[in-house]
């Protein structure tokens, strides 16, 4: 029988300080998250300098809590996994430096993990029997990709945003209609009271049969609509704006993902990233998948937002391939999927 591999994972790419202990890439023994949402809310978004300082304050206790909750000791850990990009450089460095010091002190391998790959790997935790190949829609505040996962750690990008990420567009429109931060959950709640067909906003069209996305156009259209209504001193139905905007974005995401599956002849989609917790996206993707004979997989909401369990899962598969990082590994804020 093969020995179980326990990974201690650390995530600090944005405003969550997180640590987890994961066994064999699929079983979570602990998953501790210290969120900074309440701190950044008053600024309308994440302030990088503040995020870095809070990571410094929190990381040691978060890692200790993860080890304690897992019921293990440091000597039981086989490797230390850590996000080294993409993300906010200062925030990344806090987690990376801590992980390097810890790996050195306990004489265990260091595994560098791509944050986007981590999001995809959250599905291996939710679905322990899941194996590549499959398609994955990664949709979050900073990233929007359609990816074909050929094998563990092997990806082909089929489509990506050419400007704003979907989650970024959610945040900007939420701010514009006075809903505050974080925008995604607030748009979702407001949209439940609105009419999704009340307003027709444009959607980007590419002439090269591309699977790429663009959300700057719909964002600008919503902002122009709001400005026009204000200039004309007309009442704005925020719920209708939220519902119509959300439908526009979700339909774009779903249409391109289904199209990608048909092109690649794939019958299984995994969805990942913070926006994957959006209930309207979940319902629409599952419904469209069923219509097209495609199985649709979503992680639990706690695994959609930034967490270290997903990093532990991705780190396990890197560990199995022998991809050990040097102790001079540096943060790469613009790290691309598939890069090492």
UniProtKB/Swiss-Prot annotation:
| Positions contributing to substrate binding | 138-142, 171, 184, 278
Give the enzyme class: transferase
List the EC numbers from the record. Answer: 2.3.1.234
Entry GO terms, CC: cytoplasm
| Single GO term (MF) | iron ion binding
GO BP of this protein: tRNA threonylcarbamoyladenosine modification
Give the catalytic activity: L-threonylcarbamoyladenylate + adenosine(37) in tRNA = N(6)-L-threonylcarbamoyladenosine(37) in tRNA + AMP + H(+)
Which Pfam families does the annotation name? TsaD (PF00814)
Spell out the subcellular localization from the entry. Answer: Cytoplasm
* Record key words, sorted: Acyltransferase, Cytoplasm, Iron, Metal-binding, Transferase, tRNA processing
Q: Please share the entry's free-text remark on the cofactor.
A: Binds 1 Fe(2+) ion per subunit.
**Primary location class:** cytoplasm
Named cofactor requirement(s) = Fe(2+)
- Binding locations of Fe cation: 115, 119, 306
Q: What does this protein do?
A: Required for the formation of a threonylcarbamoyl group on adenosine at position 37 (t(6)A37) in tRNAs that read codons beginning with adenine. Is involved in the transfer of the threonylcarbamoyl moiety of threonylcarbamoyl-AMP (TC-AMP) to the N6 group of A37, together with TsaE and TsaB. TsaD likely plays a direct catalytic role in this reaction.
Q: Which PANTHER family match?
A: TRNA N6-ADENOSINE THREONYLCARBAMOYLTRANSFERASE, TRNA N6-ADENOSINE THREONYLCARBAMOYLTRANSFERASE, MITOCHONDRIAL
* Similarity remark: Belongs to the KAE1 / TsaD family.
**What is the name listed in the Swiss-Prot or TrEMBL entry for this protein?**
tRNA N6-adenosine threonylcarbamoyltransferase
Q: Which organism is it from?
A: Clostridium acetobutylicum (strain ATCC 824 / DSM 792 / JCM 1419 / IAM 19013 / LMG 5710 / NBRC 13948 / NRRL B-527 / VKM B-1787 / 2291 / W)
Gene coding for it = tsaD
């Amino acid at each position: 029988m093969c020995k179980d591999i326990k990974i201690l994972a650390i995530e600090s790419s944005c405003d969550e300080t997180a640590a987890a202990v994961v066994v064999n890439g699929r079983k979570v023994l602990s998953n501790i998250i210290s969120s900074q949402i309440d701190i950044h809310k008053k600024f309308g978004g994440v302030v990088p300098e503040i995020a870095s300082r809070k990571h410094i304050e929190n990381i040691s206790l978060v890692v200790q809590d993860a080890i304690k909750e897992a019921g293990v000791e440091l000597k039981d850990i086989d490797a230390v996994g850590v996000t080294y990009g993409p993300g906010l450089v200062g925030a990344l460095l806090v987690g990376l430096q801590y992980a390097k010091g810890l790996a050195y002190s306990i004489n265990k391998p260091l595994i560098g993990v791509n944050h986007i790959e981590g999001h995809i790997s959250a599905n291996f935790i939710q679905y322990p029997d899941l194996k590549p190949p499959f398609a994955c829609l990664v949709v979050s505040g900073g990233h929007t990709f359609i990816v074909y996962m050929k094998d563990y750690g092997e990806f082909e990008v089929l489509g990506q945003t050419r400007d704003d990420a979907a989650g970024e567009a959610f945040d900007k429109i939420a701010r514009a209609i006075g809903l505050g931060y974080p925008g995604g959950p607030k748009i979702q709640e407001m949209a439940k009271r609105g009419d999704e067909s009340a307003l027709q906003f444009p959607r980007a069209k590419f002439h090269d049969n591309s699977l790429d996305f663009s959300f700057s156009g719909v964002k600008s259209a919503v902002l122009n609509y709001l400005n026009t209504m204000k200039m004309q001193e007309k009442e704005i139905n925020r719920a209708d704006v939220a519902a119509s905007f959300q439908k526009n974005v979700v339909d774009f995401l779903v249409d391109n993902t289904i199209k990608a599956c048909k092109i690649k002849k794939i019958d299984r989609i995994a969805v990942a990233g913070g926006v994957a917790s959006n209930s309207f996206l979940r319902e629409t993707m599952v419904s469209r998948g069923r219509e097209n004979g495609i199985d649709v997989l979503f992680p639990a909401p706690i695994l959609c937002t930034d967490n270290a369990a997903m990093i532990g899962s991705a780190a396990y598969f890197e560990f199995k391939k022998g991809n050990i990082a040097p102790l001079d590994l540096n943060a790469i804020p613009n790290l691309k999927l598939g890069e090492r």
